[in-house]
């Protein structure tokens, strides 16, 4: 039985080119040289062949990276391969689970949706990320706030109120 790669790619939620584009875009966003929406818009203008579905997936994943930058960046250090790829895979995994862009809002579904783009060893790595209990993370990592905001918050409210307040702001 011969597998039609084009048919498989047509049903895939994420494709290798999504990871490549996202890796480039996240690298640019992480510089914080310009507003994120401007960087994303400029990138899409430079890539006219990207379709609406591609743009939606890449944009959602890039903003997921920015929202959870602390957590994603910290876990990305544990992976192998280019950092941009690791950041892109984690961002895609998050949106497949949390934003309804995947087949189901579960880690198992997200892994299936990413099966077309992951290399050997990356599935287990993404599973470890999906199995992390958020409560086990350090407070700064859990709330994904920049350190200067977390410190300012700690200076202005009682310590026992910092975490609940920061989580409410997300």
Kindly label every feature range from the protein language model:
Residues 1-170:
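Class I Rossmann-like S-adenosyl-L-methionine
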């Amino acid at each position: 039985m011969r597998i039609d790669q084009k048919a498989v790619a047509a049903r895939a939620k994420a494709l290798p080119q999504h990871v490549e584009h996202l890796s480039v875009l996240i690298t640019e966003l992480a510089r914080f040289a310009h507003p994120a929406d401007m960087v994303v818009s400029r990138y899409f203008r430079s890539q006219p062949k990207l379709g609406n579905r591609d743009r939606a997936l890449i944009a959602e994943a890039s903003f997921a990276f920015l929202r959870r930058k602390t957590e994603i960046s910290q876990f990305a250090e544990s992976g192998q391969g280019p950092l941009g790829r690791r950041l892109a895979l984690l961002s895609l995994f998050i949106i497949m689970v949390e934003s309804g862009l995947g087949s189901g809002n579960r880690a198992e579904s997200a892994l299936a949706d990413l099966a077309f783009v992951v290399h050997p060893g990356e599935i287990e790595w993404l599973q470890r990320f999906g199995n992390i209990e958020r409560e086990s993370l350090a407070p700064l990592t859990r709330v994904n706030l920049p350190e200067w905001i977390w410190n300012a918050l700690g200076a202005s409210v009682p310590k026992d109120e910092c975490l609940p307040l920061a989580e409410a702001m997300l």
